[in-house]
Amino acid sequence: MHDATLSRSTDSSQPLVPLLEERWSPRSYDETATIGDDTLDALLEAARWAPSAANMQPRRFIVGRRGSATFRTIEQQLLGFNAAWAGRASALLVALAEVESADGDVRRWAEYDLGQAVAALAVQAHAEGLHLHQMGGIDVDGVRAAFDLPARLVPVTVTAIGTVAHPSRLDEKAAARETAPRTRLPLDEIVLVRE
């Protein structure tokens, strides 16, 4: 599609590789689009091969495609505004940090490793022509109960995965957010020391 609202490249201070420059997080998804097994496997494989401290790989995932019981269960755990639009995505993915090993060893870097895995999944998704929207607005206890998770697995985010659709499918307020200019803090605000 060539609609300007569907291509939202960055206005970065330095050139970036296209997959990073073009990545953005839509809320408007095509509710008729699906994700095949091979594509879903490619996304999860990208997450699997992300860097991991001491190769402990303290990340786990629960994924449900639209129409499945798992998708509906995940969707029911979304809070606030997220619940209004995420059901149109092709899949919902719960990202879990394994904060403790089965033997009780604490993994204080688990959320960092999980974030790297989801970032790799996001880049792979964009390469596959898909878009993600990561959400922290979830009922953590609800996710834990719905999937009978042990205490060592902490639900961190839910990610909507799918094919972007025109923002006219959203309500007026959401559509305005969808088409607003993308912004980030400048480098001098996020880099505290640089010599």
What name fits each language-model region?
Residues 1-195:
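Acidic, surface-exposed loops and disordered segments
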